[in-house]
A protein has these predicted regions:
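Short, Lys/Arg-enriched N-terminal segments with co-localized hydrophobic residues
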Residues: 14-33
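Short, polar/acidic, helix-capping and beta-turn segments at strand->helix junctions
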Residues: 34-161
Length: 161
Protein backbone atom coordinates (compact mmCIF):
# COMPACT_ATOMS: atom_id res chain seq x y z
CA UNK A 1 0.00 0.00 0.00
CA UNK A 2 1.44 3.37 -0.91
CA UNK A 3 2.36 5.96 1.71
CA UNK A 4 -0.24 8.29 0.22
CA UNK A 5 -3.11 5.86 0.83
CA UNK A 6 -1.83 4.92 4.26
CA UNK A 7 -1.74 8.60 5.23
CA UNK A 8 -5.32 9.05 4.07
CA UNK A 9 -6.43 5.93 5.96
CA UNK A 10 -4.62 7.11 9.08
CA UNK A 11 -6.18 10.59 8.99
CA UNK A 12 -9.60 9.09 8.38
CA UNK A 13 -9.01 6.69 11.24
CA UNK A 14 -8.14 9.53 13.63
CA UNK A 15 -11.36 11.32 12.79
CA UNK A 16 -13.46 8.18 13.11
CA UNK A 17 -11.62 7.01 16.22
CA UNK A 18 -12.85 10.09 18.00
CA UNK A 19 -16.41 9.25 17.00
CA UNK A 20 -16.33 5.46 17.51
CA UNK A 21 -13.88 4.83 20.31
CA UNK A 22 -11.15 3.10 18.27
CA UNK A 23 -13.08 0.27 16.66
CA UNK A 24 -12.45 1.57 13.14
CA UNK A 25 -8.66 1.03 13.24
CA UNK A 26 -9.11 -2.59 14.25
CA UNK A 27 -11.53 -3.21 11.39
CA UNK A 28 -9.35 -1.31 8.90
CA UNK A 29 -6.24 -3.29 9.82
CA UNK A 30 -8.21 -6.52 9.61
CA UNK A 31 -9.50 -5.54 6.16
CA UNK A 32 -6.03 -4.61 4.85
CA UNK A 33 -4.54 -7.90 6.06
CA UNK A 34 -7.18 -10.10 4.43
CA UNK A 35 -5.71 -12.45 1.89
CA UNK A 36 -7.32 -13.68 -1.30
CA UNK A 37 -7.59 -17.40 -1.91
CA UNK A 38 -8.59 -18.64 -5.37
CA UNK A 39 -9.87 -22.17 -5.94
CA UNK A 40 -9.01 -23.64 -9.33
CA UNK A 41 -10.51 -26.90 -10.58
CA UNK A 42 -8.32 -27.56 -13.60
CA UNK A 43 -10.94 -26.52 -16.13
CA UNK A 44 -9.27 -25.24 -19.31
CA UNK A 45 -11.69 -22.31 -19.19
CA UNK A 46 -10.13 -20.99 -16.00
CA UNK A 47 -7.11 -19.79 -17.99
CA UNK A 48 -8.92 -19.14 -21.27
CA UNK A 49 -11.47 -16.88 -19.59
CA UNK A 50 -9.43 -15.71 -16.62
CA UNK A 51 -11.60 -16.86 -13.74
CA UNK A 52 -11.60 -19.33 -10.87
CA UNK A 53 -14.29 -21.57 -9.43
CA UNK A 54 -14.35 -19.67 -6.13
CA UNK A 55 -12.70 -16.80 -4.30
CA UNK A 56 -12.38 -16.40 -0.55
CA UNK A 57 -11.42 -13.08 1.01
CA UNK A 58 -11.65 -13.03 4.77
CA UNK A 59 -14.86 -14.77 5.74
CA UNK A 60 -16.63 -14.20 2.40
CA UNK A 61 -16.72 -16.84 -0.34
CA UNK A 62 -18.10 -16.25 -3.82
CA UNK A 63 -18.59 -19.27 -6.09
CA UNK A 64 -18.69 -18.74 -9.85
CA UNK A 65 -21.58 -19.83 -12.00
CA UNK A 66 -21.41 -23.62 -12.06
CA UNK A 67 -22.99 -26.02 -14.54
CA UNK A 68 -23.44 -29.80 -14.40
CA UNK A 69 -20.31 -31.75 -15.38
CA UNK A 70 -18.96 -35.16 -14.34
CA UNK A 71 -15.36 -35.97 -15.29
CA UNK A 72 -15.48 -33.41 -18.09
CA UNK A 73 -18.76 -34.70 -19.53
CA UNK A 74 -22.03 -32.79 -19.49
CA UNK A 75 -24.79 -34.28 -17.33
CA UNK A 76 -28.25 -35.32 -18.54
CA UNK A 77 -29.22 -32.60 -20.99
CA UNK A 78 -32.93 -33.17 -20.39
CA UNK A 79 -32.96 -33.40 -16.58
CA UNK A 80 -32.87 -30.12 -14.64
CA UNK A 81 -33.20 -31.98 -11.31
CA UNK A 82 -30.12 -34.13 -11.99
CA UNK A 83 -28.17 -31.11 -13.23
CA UNK A 84 -29.02 -29.14 -10.09
CA UNK A 85 -27.96 -32.00 -7.80
CA UNK A 86 -24.67 -32.36 -9.69
CA UNK A 87 -23.99 -28.63 -9.50
CA UNK A 88 -24.65 -28.49 -5.76
CA UNK A 89 -22.46 -31.56 -5.15
CA UNK A 90 -19.62 -29.87 -7.05
CA UNK A 91 -20.12 -26.61 -5.17
CA UNK A 92 -20.16 -28.46 -1.84
CA UNK A 93 -16.69 -29.86 -2.66
CA UNK A 94 -15.40 -26.37 -3.49
CA UNK A 95 -16.70 -25.04 -0.17
CA UNK A 96 -15.02 -27.92 1.67
CA UNK A 97 -11.72 -26.98 -0.03
CA UNK A 98 -12.17 -23.55 1.60
CA UNK A 99 -12.99 -24.99 5.05
CA UNK A 100 -16.65 -24.08 4.64
CA UNK A 101 -19.87 -26.01 4.18
CA UNK A 102 -23.31 -25.62 2.69
CA UNK A 103 -24.43 -24.35 6.13
CA UNK A 104 -22.37 -21.22 5.44
CA UNK A 105 -24.28 -20.39 2.25
CA UNK A 106 -26.34 -17.23 2.58
CA UNK A 107 -27.45 -16.77 -1.03
CA UNK A 108 -27.94 -18.81 -4.19
CA UNK A 109 -28.64 -17.49 -7.66
CA UNK A 110 -30.17 -20.04 -10.02
CA UNK A 111 -30.27 -19.40 -13.75
CA UNK A 112 -32.31 -21.60 -16.09
CA UNK A 113 -33.17 -21.63 -19.75
CA UNK A 114 -36.55 -23.18 -18.96
CA UNK A 115 -38.57 -21.76 -16.07
CA UNK A 116 -41.00 -24.68 -16.33
CA UNK A 117 -38.26 -26.71 -14.58
CA UNK A 118 -38.77 -24.65 -11.41
CA UNK A 119 -40.25 -27.49 -9.35
CA UNK A 120 -37.53 -29.97 -10.35
CA UNK A 121 -34.78 -27.45 -9.61
CA UNK A 122 -36.43 -26.35 -6.35
CA UNK A 123 -36.70 -29.96 -5.15
CA UNK A 124 -33.01 -30.57 -5.84
CA UNK A 125 -32.09 -27.26 -4.18
CA UNK A 126 -34.09 -28.26 -1.09
CA UNK A 127 -32.08 -31.49 -0.85
CA UNK A 128 -29.13 -29.34 0.22
CA UNK A 129 -30.79 -26.26 1.68
CA UNK A 130 -34.15 -27.26 3.22
CA UNK A 131 -32.93 -26.55 6.75
CA UNK A 132 -30.41 -23.82 5.85
CA UNK A 133 -32.75 -21.64 3.78
CA UNK A 134 -30.39 -19.17 2.09
CA UNK A 135 -31.89 -16.29 0.14
CA UNK A 136 -32.45 -17.48 -3.41
CA UNK A 137 -33.20 -16.04 -6.81
CA UNK A 138 -34.54 -18.10 -9.73
CA UNK A 139 -33.96 -16.43 -13.07
CA UNK A 140 -35.18 -17.41 -16.52
CA UNK A 141 -32.56 -16.53 -19.12
CA UNK A 142 -32.29 -16.92 -22.87
CA UNK A 143 -29.36 -19.35 -22.96
CA UNK A 144 -26.32 -20.69 -21.15
CA UNK A 145 -22.91 -21.45 -22.71
CA UNK A 146 -24.09 -24.74 -24.24
CA UNK A 147 -27.62 -25.82 -25.19
CA UNK A 148 -27.40 -28.96 -22.99
CA UNK A 149 -27.14 -26.85 -19.85
CA UNK A 150 -30.50 -26.14 -18.28
CA UNK A 151 -29.22 -24.78 -14.96
CA UNK A 152 -26.33 -22.68 -13.69
CA UNK A 153 -25.88 -21.74 -10.04
CA UNK A 154 -23.79 -19.07 -8.29
CA UNK A 155 -23.60 -18.72 -4.54
CA UNK A 156 -22.27 -16.67 -1.69
CA UNK A 157 -21.14 -18.09 1.64
CA UNK A 158 -20.08 -16.24 4.78
CA UNK A 159 -18.14 -17.90 7.56
CA UNK A 160 -18.85 -16.94 11.15
CA UNK A 161 -16.05 -14.79 12.57
Amino acid sequence: MSVFYFTIFYKLHKILETLTGGIILYKLIKYIKMKRENILTGSPWEDKMGYCRAVRIGNIIEVSGTVAIVDGDKVKADDAHAQTLNILERVEKVLEDLNASMKDVIRTRIFTTDVSTFEAVATAHATFFKDIKPTTGFYGINQLVAPEYLVEIELTAVLAE
